[in-house]
Design a protein with these regions (language model features):
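Nucleotide/phosphate-binding catalytic cleft detector across ATP-hydrolyzing
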Residues: 1-157, 165-278, 285-297
Length: 297
């Protein structure tokens, strides 16, 4: 039985989500930290994200997680402590922690997630490492203990995990280094090539996330950036079909991985997936036209 004081943590490169059982609340913040003069915390979470691409040279803003694994253990520990402290209003009590990790990483990398909670000074009574695909399935109200095969595609910021679930376990899993970051970089490069315009990563993400609404309104994406030729800030309208075209290559990379997993799936589980479809999760899975392209494939 899960005790009353417990936390479930989903660490993503872009976002961190923490569920508190005691008050049935969920906190979602950007998984970013701003460090001043290489040592002092200047801002964290959404506040750090607001400063991204705008901060002076003495403030470094970074993601402590990269490609599904912990890249900066010290700052990740500081973030976990700060977020748990915020959720408990400064009164951190002994609690059990359940943390979701990718399946297709090494045992050493998985151990790092356990050590992260142990060393974050959050009074952990018990630490359980849960495979992320299983946690995703439970979060979507899928009966993961059923014998029915389930295909889950989790598209995150810099990785995508494709998994087959059945009988409470993971039958097959594949982690690839493609996600929202690659999508945004494709948008930036296309805008630069076609319009001689430099835009930031946050602007590229805003363009990508607004494509669906813009298409409904019959509009292009109006963006502000720096003209490479004259070196001055300018405004441009980017056609939505140009953005869709540049994203398709990365969509196909993910779809190819789905096909590889399906080719290795036992026939009976494959039949279940054919009947019940694919479950999409992760922030970048909402990118316009991905689901449509996957269905056609």
């Amino acid at each position: 039985m899960v005790p009353n004081c417990a936390y479930g943590i989903d660490l993503g490169t872009s976002n961190i989500k923490i569920y508190s059982l005691s008050d049935d609340s969920v906190m979602m913040e950007k998984n970013m930290i701003a460090i001043e003069n290489k040592k002092d915390i200047f801002a964290y979470g959404n506040s750090a994200y607001e400063m991204y691409e705008k901060a002076p040279a003495n403030i470094q803003i970074s993601h402590p997680l990269s490609n599904g694994v912990i890249a900066d253990i010290n700052n990740m520990e500081r973030l976990i402590h700060l977020f748990i402290s915020d959720m408990s209003k400064g009164n951190i009590r002994p609690a059990d922690f359940y943390i979701a990790v990718p399946t297709d990483i090494t045992e050493v990398e998985k151990r790092a997630f356990y050590d992260l909670i142990k060393d974050a000074n959050v009074k952990a009574r018990k630490i359980m490492v849960v495979e992320k695909a299983i946690a995703d399935g439970l979060g979507m109200d899928i009966d993961v203990k059923n014998s029915q095969g389930v295909l889950v595609v989790d598209i995150g910021y810099d990785t995508t995990e494709v998994s087959i679930l059945s009988l409470g376990g993971i039958v097959l899993s594949r982690l690839i280094k493609t996600g929202g970051l690659k999508f945004d970089e494709a948008v930036r490069q296309t805008v630069r090539r076609e319009f001689n315009l430099l835009i930031g990563q946050k602007t590229a993400a805003t363009i990508r996330q607004s494509i669906g609404d813009l298409e409904k309104e019959g509009k292009g994406a109006v963006v502000y950036g720096r003209d490479i030729v004259v070196g001055l800030p300018v405004e441009r309208e980017i056609p939505t079909d140009l953005i869709n075209s540049c994203l398709e290559e990365h969509f196909n990379t993910i779809i190819d991985s789905v096909k590889v997993i399906l080719e290795r799936t036992p026939p009976e589980l494959g039949a279940d997936i054919f009947k019940h479809g694919v479950y999409l999760t992760g922030g970048a899975s909402q990118t316009s036209h991905f689901a449509e392209l996957l269905q056609k494939s």
